[in-house]
Structure formats: C-alpha cells, structure tokens
Amino acid sequence: MESQQDEAVQTKGASTSSDAQDQGAEKGAKNKTTEATEGPTSEPPLSGPGRLKKTAMKLFGGKKGICTLPSFFGGGRSKGSGKVSSKKSLNKSKTHDGLSEASQGPEDVVIEETDLSTPLSKSSAQFPSSQSANGALEIGSKHKTSGTEAIEKAGVEKVPSVHKPKKSLKSFFSSIRRHRKGKTSGADQSVPGAKELEGARTRSHEHVSSISLPSSEEIFRDTRKENAKPQDAPGPKMSPAQVHFSPTTEKAACKNPEKLTRTCASEFMQPKPVLEGGSLEEPHTSETEGKVVAGEVNPPNGPVGDQLSLLFGDVTSLKSFDSLTGCGDIIAEQDMDSMTDSMASGGQRANRDGTKRSSCLVTYQGGGEEMALPDDDDNDDEEEEEEEEEEEEEEEEEEEEEEEEEEEELLEDEEEVKDGEENDDLEYLWASAQIYPRFNMNLGYHTAISPSHQGYMLLDPVQSYPNLGLGELLTPQSDQQESAPNSDEGYYDSTTPGFEDDSGEALGLAHRDCLPRDSYSGDALYEFYEPDDSLEHSPPGDDCLYDLRGRNSEMLDPFLNLEPFSSRPPGAMETEEERLVTIQKQLLYWELRREQREAQEACAREAHAREAYARDTHTRESYGRNVRARETQALEAHSQEGRVQETKVRQEKPALEYQMRPLGPSVMGLVAGTSGGSQTSHRGTTSAFPATSSSEPDWRDFRPLEKRFEGTCSKKDQSTCLMQLFQSDAMFEPDMQEANFGGSPRKAYPSYSPPEEPEEEEEEKEGNATVSFSQALVEFTSNGNLFTSMSYSSDSDSSFTQNLPELPPMVTFDIADVERDGEGKCEENPEFNNDEDLTASLEAFELGYYHKHAFNSYHSRFYQGLPWGVSSLPRYLGLPGVHPRPPPAAMALNRRSRSLDNAESLELELSSSHLAQGYMESDELQAHQEDSDEEGEEEEGEWGRDSPLSLYTEPPGVYDWPPWAHCPLPVGPGLAWMSPNQLYEPFNQSSYVQATCCVPPVAMPVSVPGRTPGDSVSQLARPSHLPLPMGPCYNLQSQASQSGRAKPRDVLLPVDEPSCSSISGANSQSQAKPVGITHGIPQLPRVRPEPFQLQPNHYRASNLDLSKERGEQGASLSTSYSSTAMNGNLAK
C-alpha cells in the first residue's frame, strides 16, 4: 500500500524516483504477484476481470507506469521539475525488486536441476534490476521488457483470480486517454515491429558478430524466463508467440509498451532455440550480473547504462523535450512508444516511421497539453491500485508456489528459445553496425571481453572520451536544442531548464554522449561536433574534395563506410540527426564528386582539344613542309633541267671556224654555216651573224670582242676585216633564227672592242643616251667589212638588205619631215626649228630608257659585254629573245635627237641630202605594213606598258662607241662617189664626224597594207642592236634566185643614177611614194606590188646629192633624220 501511495504522489507530480523504488520494494515483497497481474493486464481476454484493475493500477501507478521509459529519458518529470529521481525509482521498483525476490526460489531449483541454469537464474533475479536501472536507457528494450515479462509471467497463474480489472481498468482508460493509446500502439506496433525485427535478423544473421551487449543477453534470458512462466499459468500453455505477445501487450499498455512490443515481437517472430549460445552466455551472464549490480550502486559506472545512453541518446533527446515542456509529455511518450518499438524492432523503416511520427507530434508541442492526466484520474488510479495491492497480497502466497514451478520449466524452455532469439537480436544489433562498418576507428571505446570470449563490448563513456568532459560532447547549438525546443513554434527561444539538470543523475548520465535532435528547424544540422573528428575525415572534408584516396573509391561505398555512423557503438542504431547528417554528407560528397568528375572531364576535353590542335598544327606544318620541299625539289629540278639544257646547247654548238681572207691576213673568219647565204629569212631579213646549229642566242660570253680575238685584227686592218666580213658568205646568212637575234653581235663584229673607259667620254656629251647618226654610220662602217668592189660584193652571196637582223642599238631615227602624196596618214611635218619640239622629243626619251619587263632577264648579260642600247628602233626590233609584236602607233613628228646638239654642222650640211631608198617588200611585208598602219593605234595601248618611248629608249651610258676605223668619205656639193680605193685609206678622226656618205643599207620594217594581219606579224626588218653599216649606197639585192625564192627586195639607189638600168622600167621614179619614218618606224604608202624580177646588179657607190633643190626635183620623199637630216629619193 505504501508503494501505491507513493505512486499516487508521483502521479500528482510530487513523487520522485525514490518513491518508485519504495514502491518497487513493496512490490518486491509481493514479487511475482505484481508481475503476474501484469500479464493479463495488457491482454484483458487472457486475464480475469478482477485482477486486471488491481494489476493495471499497480503497474501504471497513475502516471508512474507510463513514465517508466520517458522518466529515464527525461520524461519522468512530466509536469514538474521536482520529479528528478522518478525515472530511476520507476525502473527499479517494479522490475528489480520483484524479479530479484521471485528468482530466489527458481534459482535453487535451477541449480538442482542443471548447472547451466544457475547463473541464468541469478542473472534473471538480479539482472532485471540492472536492466530496469541501466537498461531503461536502451531503446532496444527487448531486454528490459523481457525482464518485466518474466515478472509478469510469474504471476500468470493468478490471472483468473483478478476480479476488479474491468472497473478500474475501464475508469483508468476512460480517464487516461494516453494509456489507451499507449496500449493500442504497443499492441499494434508489436506485430510490425516483430516483422521488421525478423527481417532485420534474417538479413543480418550472417553478419552478426559474436560481440553483443551483455545486458541484452541477460535481459533476453530473463525475458524467456518470464515468458515461460505465464505459459503454464493459464492452464493451456500458450504458444511462445502468444506468451510473448501477451506480456508484450501488458507491458506496452503499462510501462513501456513499445519496449515490450519489440521484445515480444523479437521473441514471437524468431523463437530459435540455440542452446550453444545460451551455454556460452551463462558465464558471461554471471559476470554481467555483478557489473549490473555495481551499476545499480554506482550508475555512472554501469556499462549497460553507458552503452545505452550512447546508443539511444536521440530518443533521450525526444523524451527530454516532453519532460521539459510538460505539454508534450503525453505525446512524446506515445511517440517514444512508437520510437522504442521501431528501435527495438530494428528496422530502419520503423525507425524512420517512428521518427516521423515523433516529428509530427513534436511540432504539436503546445497542443499536447490537453492530453495530460488530470489529478482526478491520478487519484482514481491510486485508489484502484490500493485495492489491487490488497488483493494481490492475498494471492501472492498461492502464486509463489506456482511461479517457482513455472520458472523451472520456463528456464529450460527459455534458454533454448532465448539463445536462438538472443543471437538473432544480437545479429540485428550488429546488423545496423555492419551497415556502417568501422574499419580502423580509434574511437576510444574500451571493450571488455566477457569470460564467454564472445567479445561483447561494454562501453564506458568516460573511457570512450577520456579527453573530453561530459559536457564537451555537445555543441552550443546542441545544448540549446536540449532545453530550447519547448516553444510552440519549435524554436530555441525558451529558458526552460535543460535536460542535463536531471536527465540521468541516477544512472550517471549527467550528459548524453549522443547528439540531440533539433526541432526540425534545420539550424543545427551542420553544427555537430564529434570528438573523434570523424566529420573532418568525411567526404565533404577539404582534404577529401578531390583526393578520395581509395577509401571511398566507389560512389556507393561512402554509404557503407561513413565515419559519422562508425562513431556510434556497435549496437547503436542511427538517429535521425545522424541520418540527416549522413544524407547531407552524401549529397555534398556526390556533388563534389560530380564537380570533380566534371572538372576532370573538362580537363580531359581541354587536353584532347589541345592534342587535336597540336595534331592539326603538326599536320599543317608537315604538309607545309612537304609542299615547300616539293616546291624546292621542283625548282631544283627545273634549274637542273635548265642547266642541263644549257650544257647541251653549249655542247651542240659547233666551234667557230675561222676563214682567213687574203686581203686581211689577220682577219677573223666567221663560221661558214651549212646554211648558204642564199637562204632567205622568213622575216625578209637575213642574219649577219655566223650560223650555228642552235637557234638559241648565245649571250653568255661577255668578254669584249677585242679581247676574245686579241691579235686577230688590228685597228689598222679593221676596214679590211670589215670588207672580208662583208665578203663572207656567212656574214649576211639568211637564217631566220639568226635573224631573230640568234647570234651574238660579237660574231658579226668580232673586232669590235669598246674602250676601257667609254662612259667618262660619253658623260661629257649631252646626248649621252643617243648617238648622232653620222657617228653611228662612221662607227658602223669602221666596224663592218666594206666590199672591196661592187662586183665582188655583187658576186658575193650576201644580201645586205636582208642580212642585217642584228644591228647595234644606236641612233634615234626621229623623222621630222614626212610628206606622203595623197595618203594623208601623216601630217605634214612643220619646220624643224622649234625648240619646244626639240624639248618634247628630249623629254619623251627621258620617260624611260628601256622596257623593264622585257630587259629584266637580259639586260645584265646583254649590256655587260655589249654596251649598246636601243634608242630609236621599236621594242620588238631591239629586244633580244622577245617575240616581235605589231609596231606601235606612229609617234608625233618633230622629234629630234639630242645628238643634234653635238653635230650642228652635220645638221646644216646634211639637211639637203636625200635618201634614195627603194623598198620593195614581199607580199608578207606589205601585208604587215598595211596592218601596222591600220592597227597601230590599237596596238599602242596593248603593249606600250610604260610609255611608247620607254620601249625604245635605253639606259644612259650604254653607247660606248669605240674610235672605229674611219673611211675617208669626201663631202661636197656634187655627187659624192666613193671609190673602192678610198675604203682602204685611213682618214682623219674628224672626217667621220661630217661623213654623211650614205644612208645605211638598213631594211626598214614596213607593213604594206592590203594583207591579213597574220601574214607577216613576226617579220623583222632589222634588229635594233646592230650599228648601221657605213659605206656607199648599195642596192643590196637578196639572192632570191639562189635560195629558190624570187621575191621583190629592197633596193637602195642613188638619187640620180642613170646607170642603174638593170632595174626594169616599170619601177620608175614617178611611182615612188613618200615614206615617213617616225621614230624608227617607216611609214610607206600603199605600194602597188607589180611583179618583177630583180636582176642582180652591180652595186655602185650611190650618188648623194646634197643639194636641196636637186633632192626636191628628183625625190618624191623628203625624209629628215633628226640626227643626220638625210634626204633621199626612194626608187622603186
């Protein structure tokens, strides 16, 4: 009765844990009677109605029974802070004392029967106290519940004798809503918890290590003992499942329905009898028993309490909220029932479900106050309990005898069942630990191996964290979380005393070693602190961001290898906070891994791009190198081929054959080419150079002619040499290729040698770039072979008119006066005494001296040994190696050469001289002339690139005229006749200045209109780089008959030469047409080509009439040469 009164006081809020202990002591006197009544209480159908009321009232004790588990976790103080010690007393009073007394008798019996059962009985007797005291901490409360079940089962026999349960129980449940809920939840949750437990055991069966909590074994043994007792009591033994279920329901409804539910479920689902485990556990149990007793005396040192506090601190945090607020006490207890059930069942799903329920209820904090027990209900409960206790005292004696017998039977059955189930329980406990295996974690847990050598770890928080005080395990945020989450909003704004004030004084748990839960505000999720620095080594750690070092090589390994989980003891189950932290860590870890992989992939892509770019660059460079190499090889091959061709040309070119003429003993003979002199050139002109088998010009020998043929011909004999040269058949050999500048001027003029310093002499002249025509004539004459006699020259095969393709570039033929009868194509030339005209002509020549494009490849080697330049003749006549083009348009008249300034006397004296020029051109030349006249204007724009004058001019200093041998040519008012003897007489240096004996027998290029442009486009009348030969005017008849081509040729006749009767009368002077030679381009009128045969004539010295009147009477054309002003009659 005292115990009932104490319970009533506690229900009102004034009782303490000591009261509960006193109550437990009384109950210990009543021992099994009390527990026997408990059995039917949870399941009224199984128990009598009279016992139920008393048992329920005694067990529940008003609020005492409900607060058994919460009181330990801080819920014992449900409505007042003065209930500090109620937790301890509640846990201890019922279970410990009752079990200890009840187990005394069975202990002896067991000792007598078997040796193995002796420690079991002791453990069952003493251990439930330790279990209730320390084991209350454990949420996997199978152990405690089974202990209480043992007591309950002890009184199962007396179930029928209980007659008051319905009234008291009915009033109790009607007044106390939470008891009914607790009972229902406990009974309902027992089954799913059992299922989950069974699944967990099944899964983790292989992985469970032998190490387990000693308290669990002992509690399980006690549980089986208690279960075995009630089985026999009702008469028909209930199956173990029923037995377990009934005590579970009892306990769930009474004290901790959740624990009982879990225990019953675990036993109900897996009643595996494992005798081996039981036998092994017995010595351990005895040792544990001592430790448990020590735990009662000195709770802080109780290893079971420490372990449970570490394992299930999160639930403590939940209950602390209830106990602190007082409002949510009932809700928290109910929630804790579900939590403990889920924890006991061991399923993570159940754990989560319980957590969710608790979370929902926690947010309900303020509203749960209406569910608190009123004082009236507590008073009613006290009265009922007193009545029940009286009845129990009467029945205790009867029950004791029956219980002893039941205990003996149960001990045997229980050990079989317990051993198997205990192993399963241990397997489950370790299954959660195996889910998060600890590899090498120095957590400081000091394991105490029991004598059974199964390696059960006894965890001591003081030893586990030797370097930390009990208060250092929680962060400030976590400390606030314990006391703070008591406001309706769930925030930490309350100053209610913290949980550490009175949470675990009796059990020595002044400070919990587990992190408390927050109020789902999420504020403290990332502020956890663990003494083992496991968070620092977690994947989100700085040193683990991109250096995962194989510990978590696989993406899913971190789930199985998270250090925050390993910080818990082996049997612990993860709390919600730990799970959230784990999830957060995993998210962070995966995010970092993803970023790492993205960075690696980006680096790989970048490296690949660089490699591709390098490959492309290398490919392009190699391709460029190959292309350049191929080009270089091609160029080398081309140059090699050119060199080979040049070598071949040089090899094929025959050696020069020298023919010594009798008149010139040292005259150098020219090559007597196989092609006869009678061969007619296709261009109407013949080559004056020795014929060679190669048509390519040879300009490579740059030595002066005099040096090349030193000693062969003296200056004294130059005239003789020239005569021999003219008499030579090869001198004017009609070779078309030679006419196209195939030969070198040195061949034609071998004795020519420019002075050593000709440029200084020329610099003194103002007409540096041009040479006076008289000077050119004299120089040409001195450099050419004059015929010894007209007969000899006529007998020779040379056709002078056609055989001068390469004359030295010389004078500017600026014809100032051109009169054409009836044609009108050339304007009348005004008087050539205008200084402006002279200036214009001089400026025109200054525009350019030579055509750069054409001379670039030839000027270097052309002018080195042959310093002659083109001044007045067209570009297509004067440039070597260039195919002839149509002549440009007629230049303006009134052009004078600068050489006039140096030869004014010549201009005065020779102004009246007439040019007797008969030009009978072949049909091809006539057609060319006609086309050139008509197309001259058009062609000028085509190929006059720089300037029309630049095509004919040449750089200054190229006229290095040597002091040629001079031929004495008398000049007078009458006809000037040159006797052959005069050709050999030397004359004064000054004589050649005034020597205007004859117009050089140059075949001017004339295109006769009336022909198609293609007839004689490439016909060349005369090369421009050879000097005009000086001498008497010849009628150089081409030897057409010898070449098989009888075509009209050019005829140069004296103005008044009646002796030239060999020319047919048809070619009379009356038919002569004026020819205008503008800038070296003769402009002939349309000549009617009357067919005739030119007979070979004796070329006699022409009569040059220097008088103007006579020239006007006898000549139809007055041609004024700017440099020599020579007028003559053109005779056809």
UniProtKB/Swiss-Prot annotation:
PTM annotation (N-acetylmethionine): residues: 1
* Encoding gene (name): Amer1
Q: Which Pfam families match?
A: AMER (PF09422)
Q: State whether it acts alone or in a complex, and with which partners, per the record.
A: Interacts with CTNNB1, AXIN1, LRP6, KEAP1, APC and BTRC. Interacts with SCF (SKP1-CUL1-F-box protein) E3 ubiquitin-protein ligase complexes containing BTRC and/or FBXW11. Identified in the beta-catenin destruction complex containing CTNNB1, APC, AXIN1 and AXIN2. Interacts with WT1.
Asked whether the keyword DNA-binding is assigned, the reply is: no
One function term, GO molecular function aspect: beta-catenin binding
Where located? Answer: Cytoplasm; Cell membrane; Nucleus
- Recorded family membership: Belongs to the Amer family.
Q: What is this protein called?
A: APC membrane recruitment protein 1
GO annotations of cellular component type: cytoplasm; nuclear body; plasma membrane
InterPro entries from the UniProt entry: AMER
User: Any one Gene Ontology biological process term?
Assistant: positive regulation of protein ubiquitination
- Biased composition (Low complexity) is annotated at 121-133
Entry keyword annotation includes Zinc: no
Identify the species of origin.
Mus musculus
Ranges where the record places region Disordered: 1-256, 268-301, 338-423, 469-505, 674-699, 736-770, 924-949, 1038-1132
Described purpose of this protein according to its UniProt entry? Regulator of the canonical Wnt signaling pathway. Acts by specifically binding phosphatidylinositol 4,5-bisphosphate (PtdIns(4,5)P2), translocating to the cell membrane and interacting with key regulators of the canonical Wnt signaling pathway, such as components of the beta-catenin destruction complex. Acts both as a positive and negative regulator of the Wnt signaling pathway, depending on the context: acts as a positive regulator by promoting LRP6 phosphorylation.
In which tissues has expression of this protein been reported? Expressed in kidney.
Compositional bias annotation for Polar residues: 1-21, 475-486, 677-696, 1059-1072, 1115-1132
User: Where does the record place Basic and acidic residues bias?
Assistant: 24-35, 195-208, 218-229, 281-290
Tell me what topology the record assigns in the membrane.
Peripheral membrane protein
